[in-house]
Design a protein with these regions (language model features):
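PAS/PAS-like sensory domain cap-loop motif
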Residues: 33-44, 55, 102
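PAS/PAS-like sensory domains
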Residues: 15, 67-78
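PAS/Per-ARNT-Sim sensory domains
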Residues: 55-66, 77
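Conserved hydrophobic beta-strand signature of PAS-family and PAS-like sensory domains
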Residues: 26-27
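PAS-family sensory domains
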Residues: 20, 80-86, 93-96, 99, 104-115
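PAS/LOV and related PAS-like sensory modules
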Residues: 1-22, 122-149, 155-168
């Protein structure tokens, strides 16, 4: 899958990121997502999102999908995730929709915060990353956006929307959720 400059900002990001299609199949993820779940990226692509959630959390994940279909986004949704070794961790899911040039929903960009890792150091790292990513997206908008094809513009717009949403998350408050 071709990676635009906008998507490259997520490659080794400190946050877990995945892109899914409109039926919940994982189309892409970053190394942080794969590593935290204990898989190779190639083992994740093409799998349904439910493979990374224990059965007792399927209803919560289903509710999250329902909210996403109805509103185009999901914010602060606590869901338990399952690693390949069977261990679990509480995560906080944030998702924004991706649309094509005709405003048809293609899928979502999803960021998951591992709530067990919400230290002051990690929060500082996230804030720095969000700031740098927003700056990079601003550069792309200014210098490259007009030359992008429709698919790349759609990807850029989806990522910009995601980072705009993430910049409103109170990361310090996440330390208290578990």
């Amino acid at each position: 899958m071709h990676q635009t400059e906008a998507r490259k900002t997520l490659k080794d990001a400190p946050v877990m990121w995945r892109r899914i299609n409109s039926i919940g199949i994982i189309l892409d993820c970053n190394s942080t997502y794969a590593t935290n779940l204990g898989y190779a990226k190639s083992e994740i692509i093409g799998k349904p999102i439910f493979e990374h959630v224990p059965k007792e959390s399927w209803e919560a994940m289903n509710d999250s999908l329902k909210t996403w279909f109805e509103t185009g986004e999901v914010t602060d949704r606590k869901i338990t995730f399952k690693r390949q070794d069977g261990s679990t961790f509480p995560g906080l899911l944030q998702a924004t929709s991706l649309y094509d040039e005709n405003k048809n929903m293609l899928g979502s960009n999803t960021v998951i915060f591992d709530l067990t890792q919400m230290t002051d150091e990690k929060i500082t790292e996230y804030k720095k990353f969000f700031s740098e990513a927003n700056n990079r997206l601003g550069e792309i908008k200014e210098k490259e956006y007009g030359q992008l094809d429709e698919s790349s513009k759609s990807e850029y717009d989806g990522l910009k929307k995601m980072f705009d949403m993430l910049s409103t998350v109170d990361l310090r408050k996440l330390k208290q959720i578990q």
